Regions:
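Mobile amphipathic helical/loop "lid" adjacent to a hydrophobic cofactor/ligand pocket
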Residues: 2, 72-196
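Mid-domain catalytic core of redox enzymes
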Residues: 32, 245-376
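Conserved flavin/dinucleotide-binding core of flavoenzymes
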Residues: 53, 113, 333-438
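Conserved Rossmann-like nucleotide-cofactor binding loop
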Residues: 21, 44, 278
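Glycine-rich FAD pyrophosphate-binding loop
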Residues: 30-55
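N-terminal Rossmann-like FAD-binding beta1-loop-alpha1 element of flavoenzymes
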Residues: 11-38
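N-terminal glycine-rich dinucleotide-binding loop that anchors FAD/FMN and/or NAD(P) in oxidoreductases
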Residues: 52-78
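Helical element adjacent to the flavin cofactor pocket in flavoenzyme catalytic cores
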Residues: 201-261, 266-269
């Protein structure tokens, strides 16, 4: 394939951001023989695919602190990529528990693995509010499944729809919002503003609305760095600790995109902004009104991830320990957090509980803290979903492309899909020029 601009120079493409979107875009462009440079501001490639080494029980091994699992039904591009790279995976699970305060200083604990864990606290067998919650779960699954199969979904926020349908407070606070917090890493008020249609489609696609025939969840053996390293090795021109300060686009001509880093200015023919939408907007010194409207419409929830071995954050009853463990505080505006029990998510060679706590309410024992990281996740309210639909209107204009998980549901497959789509568009553009020149 020819890789020249219309002035006969070799076409240069910059990909800014080395999360799954940037990695996949740069990897596919490099494999296609194009001149691509991957530029990452941080100290490692991978973004939320962040594997760190720990030493426990006399063994040193890697654990993941961001991206953890995928399934065999809704991650087709990721599965294809892992097959292409020869990445080994192992079975994982999606068990879920809830731990939150009740009146009188009591604590509610339950988990969804089986009837024994649902009624981990036997008193709940006689609690009418708990039993109402269970009935509401079954009702919600029926209603949401019917909507998912019925075509057009109501344009309404999740919280407003729950009010219309008279779902109990216990269903919201003890089940639906905890489950959503585990999935989207955001607080309750943000989830209630989530578009009902997006929520229902996601739950349906991921098999969350039925007890049987759920997808099999898997994880990368040895940690997600095993796939990241293989992708990075296929990208000859790559840079770490190289934060981009600004991106300016010219009105035409070769190398019309000017990128500023700490090392100075560099010119490219195309730029792919494979970072969060707010970061992309901050880099565009000459952002147009349509770009500004879309990129500014998506908000982000900052999340602190603490890697530790303090099991006191998990349910008091060990039978309720799950892969994903939700906890909330007793405040009027309760704090929420999720504790990911990595021993149940990944095949770890140790018996010591290894936990990633997202926004922990109670700080883990400092002597048991292994590391801490800051992540951010997109907030999918009505404004964000509307903005996503407008991205295609200017994708590729002024030789500027946008990619990231924020263009979909916010998950790994979404970031990968967006990066591959941009790479395919650029590759097709080059092929079209080759055909025109022939």
């Amino acid at each position: 394939m020819t890789n020249k601009n219309k002035w006969g120079n070799r076409m240069k493409i910059a990909v800014v951001g080395a999360g799954i979107a940037g990695l996949s875009c740069a990897y596919r462009l490099a494999r296609s023989g194009l001149d691509v440079t991957l530029i990452e501001a941080g100290p490692y490639f991978g973004g939320h695919s962040n594997t760190v080494d720990v030493a426990l029980d006399g063994v040193e091994f890697g654990v993941d602190t961001g991206f953890l699992v995928f399934n065999d039904r809704t991650y087709p591009n990721l599965i294809k990529l892992f097959d292409e790279l020869g990445v080994a995976t192992a079975p994982s699970e999606m068990s879920f528990s809830v731990k939150l305060p009740r009146a009188g200083g009591r604590t509610l604990e339950w988990a969804g693995a089986n009837l024994d864990t649902v009624f981990a606290q036997r008193a709940n067998l006689l609690d009418p509010r708990f039993l109402r919650m269970l009935r509401d779960i079954l009702r919600f699954n029926r209603q949401a499944s019917a909507m998912a199969h019925g075509g057009e979904l109501p344009r309404i926020a999740l919280g407003a729809w729950l009010d219309e349908q008279d779902y109990s407070p216990q269903f919201r606070q003890w089940y639906l919002l905890p489950m959503a917090a585990c999935i989207w890493s955001c607080p309750s008020d943000q989830m209630l503003a989530f578009p009902l249609s997006t929520f229902v489609r996601f739950c349906h696609n991921h098999g969350l609305l039925q007890v049987s025939d759920r997808p099999q969840w898997r994880t990368v053996k040895g940690g997600s760095r095993n796939y990241v390293d293989k992708m990075v090795a296929a990208i000859p021109s790559r840079r770490l600790l190289a934060p981009v300060r600004s991106v300016l686009r010219g009105t035409g001509g070769a190398r019309a995109v000017r990128i500023e880093t700490g090392a100075g200015f560099e010119h490219f023919d195309h730029v792919v902004l494979a970072c969060h939408s707010d970061q992309a907007l901050a880099l565009l010194g000459d952002a147009r009104s349509d770009e500004r409207a879309v990129l500014s419409a998506i908000r982000y929830q900052p999340n602190r991830a603490v890697l530790h071995t303090d099991a006191s954050c998990l349910p008091a009853r060990r039978k309720a320990w799950s892969a994903w463990n939700y906890q909330s505080s007793a405040a009027a505006a309760p704090q929420v957090c999720v504790h990911y029990l990595l021993n149940m998510l990944q095949p770890l060679p140790c018996s010591t509980p290894v936990i990633v706590s997202l926004n922990p309410i109670d700080a883990p024992d400092p002597a048991k803290v292994l590391a801490a990281f800051d992540y951010a996740h997109p907030v999918f309210d009505q404004a964000a979903v509307a903005a996503q639909a407008r991205l295609a209107q200017f994708q590729g204009e002024q030789n500027t492309w946008f990619a990231g998980a924020w263009t979909g549901y916010g998950f790994h497959e979404d970031g990968l899909k967006s990066g591959l789509a941009v790479a395919a568009s650029l590759t097709a553009m080059m092929a079209g020029r080759q055909h025109a020149a022939a």
